[in-house]
Amino acid sequence: GKKVLKERDAREHLNCVFIGHVDAGKSTFCGQILYQTGQVDVRTIEKYEKEAKEKNRESWFLAFIMDTNEEERAKGKTVEVGRAHFATSEKRYTIMDAPGHKSYVPNMIAGASQADIACLVVSARKNEFEAGFEKGGQTKEHAMLAKTLGVKFLVVVVNKMDDPTVNWGQARYDEITSKLKPFLKSCGFLVKKEVKFLPISALTGANLVAAVADSTCPWWGPMYKAGTHNTDQGALLPL
């Protein structure tokens, strides 16, 4: 009989951990990635939409893909590190959705210690970025831990750019990135080489698979094409 050798998947495998302050949108972001890469079907999404509505958390339906236990869904908080897999034509990924709440830092450390890449999610919404970045917020703590645990590459996603308080405004994006750069440098990241910045909306999926439309955000195209933000790609997955 013929021997059929299972071909080894030659695509590079990367572990990516999603970190950041509570409510920055990490679970929604992970859910959106899985949806856009075809890991979740429309029926499942519709089921989650219905369930989220019943729990008065309408905008949380994508997060339910990652937050599978009842406690997480009821509170709208991630407690354990959620894991999922997806692949692009070039790479295979395992994504880990780490809890952002202060009392769950040990769980977050467990996730980050296995990661090749960390994705730091910050919220652009008025006051939310500040809550995560100022005293007591988890944005700084998570970024420092990621560096300490040996994460070599960081993608900073500025989420909720579609929020009415932001409306894809460049001023807010610039304000946030200019605060983060010196801080990340102080953590030991070589900002020009090891950190990329990207404005996104996890809820609408803008800038995930394809760059956001110029009509929505006219300044992003020229910015990434000029390479000013260490990125030559307009959207996250091509990175």
Feature annotation, model-predicted:
Residues 152, 163-239:
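Canonical P-loop GTPase G-domain recognition
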Residues 5-106, 115-128:
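P-loop NTPase switch module centered on the Walker A-proximal segment
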